[in-house]
């Protein structure tokens, strides 16, 4: 069997859903499990409606609710011009009623808990999958019966052993030649049956977990680009699809801002040894990227990525000199405040680290000031150079920084696996940095014409 995951842009309207149905029909001999996101913009609309309700503006929240349901009924009406199947019509009515009750509850309490937000957010995937399942005439499975998670609403962690057992019991019997099964990405439920979500972009993660649990031959991520590109095409129009990526390269790119894959997607596939392919819904037989355990591209640099804004914290203390355990104490403070660190660079008496720009720093800084002084640089961007051959190619880092000679690099960090060289620049310099580096990657030439 295979897993076919389609993102929001791939199920945005009736035309897109027909294209998805055609792709699934072509893959029926491979017993596809179809995993869908909400239709484009739906999750954002649900979040906005929830915030309006929390603010006490129930009228605005319900107006967004009506617009959302009307849009989905319009899509369904285009797909079924002679009338909606009774099961689909009933499902849309039920989901509309559920959303209405949830929004009214939030407005009444003027409180939007993560638990309530997850319940509201789940409506999007349940709407899109109901319509596509009806279009395909396929069984519809509520992912919440299979995707068992912990209680961390908004960013729930799947309980992989339970997911595997539930998938084997509830999904596998439905799979068979010439039949698809439709379920949702992004959503799950805890042990008490309360709805959870895996965080924004979590549909990819769902697809990988389902694929690993069922021993899929291939996990296909269908999106609106021809695979993973060498760089963000909005920044570098010359960016090209990458035919093959290693699991390690893909994980680094996802972690450092490549938008095609959710960062957590790769691990279940790695553990199960299942290739992941990233394909274009509108160009199904065009170029695509295969992500596998081993690849042999021969390129010193495979791709570039960036992530920002981030904040750089420089922690300085004379206690670092000749003292063991300083870094352990430092990171214990970050752990206590549940703040993740992306990059780290050390000197004799200082450590520079990057954290997300929206990380809550006030209490962290108060604790750090007990044993160090802390400098803060905001509005920075991490630029990452990723490639399996990076560590094996003499001089490539020199050529990269030669390309950046007109850009001030504030921090440098080499990944422990030596396939990721990252550096920090001011946010306004990130675009120029990527555009300067891409010719080194794409043509194998530095800006002055020298060969790597």
Describe every region a protein language model picked out.
Residues 1-2, 31-34, 73, 138-139, ...:
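Structural motif
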């Amino acid at each position: 069997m295979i897993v076919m995951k389609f993102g929001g842009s791939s199920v945005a309207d009736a035309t897109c859903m027909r294209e998805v149905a055609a792709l699934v029909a072509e893959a029926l001999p491979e017993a596809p499990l179809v995993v869908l996101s909400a239709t484009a913009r739906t999750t954002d609309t649900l979040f906005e409606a929830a915030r309006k309700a929390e603010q006490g503006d129930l009228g605005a929240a319900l107006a967004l609710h009506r617009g959302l349901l009307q849009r989905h009924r319009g899509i369904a009406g285009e797909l079924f011009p002679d009338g909606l199947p009774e099961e689909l019509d009933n499902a849309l009515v039920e989901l509309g009623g559920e959303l209405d009750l949830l929004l009214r509850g939030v407005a009444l309490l003027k409180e939007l808990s993560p638990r309530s937000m997850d319940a509201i957010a789940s409506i999007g995937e349940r709407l899109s999958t109901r319509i596509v399942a009806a279009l395909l005439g396929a069984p519809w499975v509520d992912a919440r019966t299979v995707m068992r998670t912990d209680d961390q609403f908004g960013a729930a962690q799947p309980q992989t052993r339970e997911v595997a057992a539930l998938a084997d019991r509830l999904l596998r019997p439905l799979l068979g030649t010439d039949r698809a099964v439709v379920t949702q990405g992004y959503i799950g439920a805890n042990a008490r049956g309360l709805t959870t979500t895996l965080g924004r972009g979590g549909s990819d993660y769902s697809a990988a977990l389902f694929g690993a649990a069922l021993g899929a031959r291939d996990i296909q991520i269908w999106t609106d680009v021809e695979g993973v590109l060498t760089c963000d095409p909005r920044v570098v129009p010359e960016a090209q699809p990458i035919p093959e990526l290693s699991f390690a390269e893909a994980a680094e790119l996802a972690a450092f801002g490549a938008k095609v894959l959710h960062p957590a997607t790769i691990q279940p596939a790695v553990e199960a040894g299942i290739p992941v392919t990233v394909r274009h819904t509108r160009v199904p037989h065009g170029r695509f990227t295969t992500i596998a355990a081993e690849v042999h591209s021969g390129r010193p640099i495979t791709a570039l990525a960036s992530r920002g804004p981030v904040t750089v914290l420089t922690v300085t203390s004379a206690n670092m000199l000749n003292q063991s355990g300083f870094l352990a104490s430092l990171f214990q403070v970050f752990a206590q405040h549940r703040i993740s660190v992306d990059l780290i660079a050390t000197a004799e008496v200082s450590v520079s680290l990057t954290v997300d720009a929206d990380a809550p720093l006030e209490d962290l800084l108060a604790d750090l000031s007990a044993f160090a002084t802390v400098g803060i640089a905001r509005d920075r961007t991490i630029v990452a150079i990723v490639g399996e051959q990076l560590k094996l190619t003499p001089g490539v880092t020199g050529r990269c920084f030669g390309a950046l000679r007109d850009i001030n690099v504030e921090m440098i960090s080499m990944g422990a696996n030596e396939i990721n060289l990252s550096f920090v620049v001011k946010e306004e310099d990130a675009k120029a940095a990527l555009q300067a580096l891409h010719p080194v990657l794409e043509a194998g030439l530095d800006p002055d014409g020298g060969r790597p």
